[in-house]
Regions:
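Long, hydrophobic alpha-helical segments
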Residues: 206-264
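Conserved helicase ATPase core of P-loop NTP-dependent helicases/translocases
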Residues: 102-147
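Short glycine-/polar-rich loops that comprise or flank the Walker A/P-loop
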Residues: 58, 115-116, 158-161, 192-197
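Conserved interdomain linker/interface between the two RecA-like ATPase lobes of SF2 helicase motors
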Residues: 1-77, 119
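Short mixed-charge
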Residues: 84-112
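Conserved segment of the helicase C-terminal RecA-like domain
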Residues: 157, 168-218
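SF2 helicase motor core recognition
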Residues: 130-135, 145-160, 182-193
Length: 560
């Protein structure tokens, strides 16, 4: 056969390093057992371990279970790390550091880490920055990368040494498939002939850590089943049937007894189930849930869903949809823009509050948009989200949005510090660099996962219903579009439709007098872009993105 694999497994050495008692063990892949090699110094830390085992020409990946741990371990490692670089590498790292400083914030830990060839790789980083970090690692300019599970999720970055600091992925255990995927980063034939995997038991690791590492290494991957079969437990599937029998789409019996992700998965399954039942579609979900209901109960559920108006979306349930229809029918619309074309903060707060009521966020988004003050029962996070949302839709740059978020925390320190929707500190201390970095991380995470996902979905449903009731295919002042593109500016929106990321599109628009020729129109745009000037402009993202867009849409450019 002429077929060949780009990557092939090579020699992997696996070690267990217990920083509590200093024990170092090697794993024998054939006997499926650990062999004690000796004891390390009592002063051994993760930082000194990484430095001790890796040569100057080797690259390291350190896996951490949480965003907080990832950032803190990267900062700790940087304190005693002084690598040597070529002049070309120094220039590349300094340029990347400067761009992160300008695009995000001067006090962001990543700004100084990058200069030392260290980075952290987390999902909320802007796509352009994340891509450049990945490229710098592939080019051996970045030597050590601290990461969360984003590395498991499709990012192809091989390394020489992998340090696993926890058996968890967030609050859940790392499953065997994900673990094998993770250690597969080490030992690829086009990168190195062998690699080392170090499973590290940190001083603060729980007592299960060593046993869990052993289980992940020794035992084979169990037979896999579809997520719709395995994600929900039996009692949760029974709760879905019970809820639907009583038209209880809120799943009241489980609302406060499940995690946010489990509750959301229950809702999705329930909504798919009733849509498939309505359409007589014997899907896998229907087959699964029918196991927990009698034929008579299925008939009752079918009778119930005949009484409710069907929704085409599985993002909102029938009770939410009814509230939405009534809200739009009452004359609701998106608030008007300000005279300068930007979005008003108070209008955003008011509109989000209205949506929170009709969409029942306190029930369906209890950890984020619907987080409720225990004393007042108000949606206490709405002002925080509105502070970010109105600037995002108005086209503010990330650095400006982050600066505003930091100011918000300084004004309302009692709102505390949050990481991944969990409160980690009760008060914000403006003099604490860690607190500022947590706010930066929370802001970027809010944009990525709340604004661009949750809010965008709810705005899309509102816009769809508004167009339906008003007989429009499109309409001006569509906030769903403003959220999707992060601006109200028509030129910036067009540039993003053609392939530029938001920051590059904003840069081009802000320099339109030099970079855009409005005297020439085409079938696809009321302007053309000046290719040569774009390729030589100071903005790195614009220079990187332009060649690919030119290949795909050459008629958008002139050579000038």
């Amino acid at each position: 056969s002429n077929q060949k694999s780009t990557y092939a497994p090579v020699c992997q050495m696996k070690y267990l390093v217990d920083l509590k008692d200093g024990a170092v063990k090697a794993f024998n892949d054939y006997s499926k057992s650990f062999i004690k090699m000796g004891n390390a110094s009592s002063r051994l830390t993760l930082t000194s371990l990484i430095n001790y085992v890796s040569r100057d020409d080797e690259q390291n990946i350190a896996y951490c279970s949480s965003l907080r741990e990832t950032i803190e371990q990267a900062v700790e490692y940087s304190k005693n790390y002084n690598p040597s670089f070529t002049e070309k590498q120094k220039a590349e790292l300094n340029k990347l550091s400067k761009d992160i400083k300008n695009e995000i914030n001067a006090d962001y830990f990543l700004v100084d880490l990058i200069k030392k060839g260290i980075a952290f790789h987390v999902g909320y980083l802007p796509a352009s920055i994340r891509k450049r970090i990945e490229d710098a690692f592939k080019n051996h300019t970045i030597k050590t990368l601290f990461c969360t599970s984003t590395l498991i999720e499709g990012v192809n970055l091989p390394a020489d040494n992998l340090f696993i600091t926890d058996y968890k992925n967030g609050r859940k255990n790392l499953d065997k498939v994900s673990f094998k995927n993770l250690i597969g980063r080490i030992g690829r034939i086009d990168h190195s002939l062998f690699g080392n995997v170090f499973m590290v038991c940190l001083p603060n690791s729980d007592v299960k850590t060593i046993d869990r590492y052993a289980d992940l290494l020794i035992n084979d991957i169990p037979e896999q089943s579809l997520s719709i079969e395995s994600t929900l437990k039996t009692h949760q599937k029974k709760a879905i049937i019970k809820g639907l029998l009583n038209n209880d789409f809120e799943m009241s019996s489980k609302h406060d007894k499940t995690t946010n992700s489990e509750f959301n998965f229950m809702r999705k399954e329930a909504l798919i189930f009733i849509n498939d039942l309505r359409n007589n579609n014997e899907s896998l979900i229907v087959k699964q849930l029918k196991k927990f209901a009698t034929p008579d109960q299925i008939e009752i559920i079918k009778s119930n869903i005949k009484q409710i108006e069907p929704t085409k979306s599985i993002d909102i349930s029938p009770d939410q949809f009814k509230n939405l229809k009534d809200f739009v029918a009452s004359g609701a619309k998106y608030p008007d823009l300000l005279p300068d074309g930007t979005v008003d903060y108070k209008s955003v707060v008011s509109f989000l509050t209205d949506l929170g009521n009709i969409y029942k966020w306190s029930i369906y988004e209890k950890r984020t948009l619907g987080y409720t003050d225990k004393i007042t029962s108000n949606l206490s996070h709405v002002t925080w989200y509105a502070n970010i949302l109105y600037k995002w839709m108005s086209g503010y740059g990330l650095s400006s949005i982050i600066y505003g978020a930091i100011q918000y925390k300084e004004k309302y320190p009692e709102t505390g510090i949050w990481a991944n929707n969990w409160k980690i500190e009760d008060y914000y201390d403006k003099n604490n660099p860690k607190h500022k970095n947590y706010v930066i991380a929370d802001t970027l995470n809010t944009i990525e996962n709340i604004i661009l996902f949750s809010v965008a979905n709810y705005f899309r449903e509102f816009s769809t219903e508004y167009k339906l009731q008003n007989g429009n295919k499109s309409f001006d002042n569509d906030w769903y579009e403003y959220v999707e593109y992060g601006t109200t500016n028509k030129i910036t929106i067009l540039l993003q439709r053609y392939g530029y990321h938001r920051e590059a599109a904003s840069y081009i628009n802000s320099h339109k007098n030099e970079l855009i020729d409005f005297s020439i129109t085409t079938d696809i745009a009321p302007f053309v872009l000046k290719k040569k000037l774009l390729l030589n402009c100071p903005d790195e993202s614009t220079k990187i993105e332009t060649p690919e867009i030119y290949i795909n849409i050459p008629e958008l450019f002139i050579e000038e």
